[in-house]
């Protein structure tokens, strides 16, 4: 991240918190299983920016539908309260590192990765 525009980081909530994480935001709609709030060390749980329950269930049942999930999630982020929550995340990034936390096992296809991509696209 040196010299360029700050970027959102993503990390599984089950991974140890580090100083480099900066502001830690859980972006899942549901609290992750088998982890306490103390262990998670989150600064904010932002349910409003998470995919809707319907979209989450649809994607969970069809991991091959990544591109369709991205498109549907982008539409959701254009509506309130998700739009305001996304704007708050972008504002926090201007103040320092922001790590988007998620619980999914798939490190490449999850809502935090989708959110990171969509926020980056909206900022460029």
Can you describe what each PLM-predicted range is?
Residues 2-124:
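Residues lining hydrophobic/aromatic ligand-binding pockets adjacent to catalytic sites
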């Amino acid at each position: 991240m040196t010299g360029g525009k700050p970027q959102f980081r993503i990390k599984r909530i089950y991974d140890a918190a580090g100083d480099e994480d900066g502001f830690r935001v859980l972006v899942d709609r549901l609290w992750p299983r088998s982890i306490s709030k103390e262990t998670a060390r989150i600064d904010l749980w932002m349910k409003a920016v998470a995919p809707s329950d319907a979209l989450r269930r649809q994607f969970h049942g069809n991991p091959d539908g990544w591109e369709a999930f991205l498109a549907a999630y982008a539409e959701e982020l254009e509506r309130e309260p998700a739009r305001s929550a996304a704007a708050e995340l972008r504002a926090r990034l201007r103040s320092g590192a922001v790590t988007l936390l998620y619980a999914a096992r798939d490190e490449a296809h999850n809502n935090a990765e989708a959110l990171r991509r969509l926020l980056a696209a909206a900022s460029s």
